[in-house]
Amino acid sequence: NSKFEIRNSKLVLEEHNLKPITLKSKEGLALINGTQFMSAYGVYCLIKANQLLAKTDFIASISIDAFDCRLEPFHHLLHDIRPHKGQIATAKKILENLADSEIAKQHKVQVQDQYAFRCIPQVHGASKDAIEHINKIFTTEINAVTDNPNVFAEEDLILSGGNFHGQTLAIHLDFLAIALAELGSISERRTYQLISGQRNLPAFLVSNP
């Protein structure tokens, strides 16, 4: 409930007996001629993405129970023969979430469930692997030097290059968008199945739609 207000920075500095920073040679250029904003934006997006990842498997588990799905698609043997890290982790988490579910232990009439349920490890896992890779890219970037030119004092060299170019970040932000879109897509398909009047569930999950 904190209240914020926009104030004149000059007045705030004076209140605290501080003087504005006077930029020296090259410091101004270093602040604007690099990937600082892209990096900050990407890290913010990744923080949000990782928060979302922490919830996706739990939400999916609830959907699996609500739709009375089989748990065979999450058996570790299926994922051991296609050992992608995210896929294995997702299947394991689903089984952990539903370990005490009475619904999951009941006899199932259907032989298989819809893709949106039985392919959760493959879809969620792919997005997890993608986001893990993107995390590594941005970790490297925020610990890198991206201004230009670059001064190498020990070598007594000033070199002009292209480290300011943000192509690496741009491509991986697109990759992040794809990974998140896939999580949203499969979630939407599960939602549709849940409200479509199947498995003895009322249409739209209400008694009088």
Task: Kindly give the residue locations of the regions a language model identified.
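Short secondary-structure boundary micro-motifs
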Residues: 13-15, 28, 34-35, 123-124, ...
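Mobile "lid/hinge" segments at catalytic clefts and subdomain interfaces of large enzymes
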Residues: 1, 5-95
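Short, functional N-terminal and low-complexity linear motifs
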Residues: 21-28, 57-64, 101-106, 141-145, ...
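Charged, low-complexity, helix-prone segments enriched in Lys/Glu/Asp/Gln
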Residues: 45, 49-52, 120-123, 127, ...
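Active-site-adjacent bridging/hinge elements
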Residues: 28-34, 147-155, 194-200
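Accessory "access/gating" subregions that flank catalytic or transport cores
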Residues: 64-185
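C-terminal catalytic subdomain
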Residues: 167-209
